[in-house]
């Protein structure tokens, strides 16, 4: 059975004080993935190419927000993007609405078993502002993912 996207929530840890930064009013999130490169293993006598799996190459994730200069999380995100700070991100799925992650004593996410999670590291590489007729001002924020995302299913 499929899970609804509505009710999902994006979080990161503010490196200034290791506090939880709740990203307000996310509209969509896409591209949290690493593609597996190919290593060609074809011999000259072969008539079809053959491959083995190579290194994983992290991609660029994006999330869209209705940008609001009155929203502290949006201002802080823009500051962190400008600084090029690598952040740890947590995407809480809709199977545990309203359940934020904890932050442990070492400043890492401590996720709960009552919600599914997708954890990944990355720095924001874009924070453009889009102004169009009959819409809210929004930003499609780019994140260069670093390493392999970790998918943690709900267990309770």
Where do the language-model regions lie?
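Short beta-strand and beta-hairpin "edge-sheet" elements
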Residues: 96-151
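Short conserved beta-strand and strand-loop elements enriched in small hydrophobics
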Residues: 11-12, 86-94, 108-111
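Short, surface-exposed, polar/charged, turn-prone segments marking secondary-structure boundaries
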Residues: 39, 53, 90-94, 146, ...
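Solvent-exposed edge beta-strands and adjacent loop segments
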Residues: 1-69, 121-137, 149
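Beta-strand-rich interaction surfaces with strong enrichment in secreted/lumenal proteins
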Residues: 50-53, 77, 108
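Structured, beta-strand-rich domain cores
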Residues: 55-103
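General N-terminal targeting signals
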Residues: 46, 61, 78-82, 106, ...
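Short, charged, solvent-exposed linker or helix-capping segments at domain edges/interfaces
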Residues: 74-76, 152-156
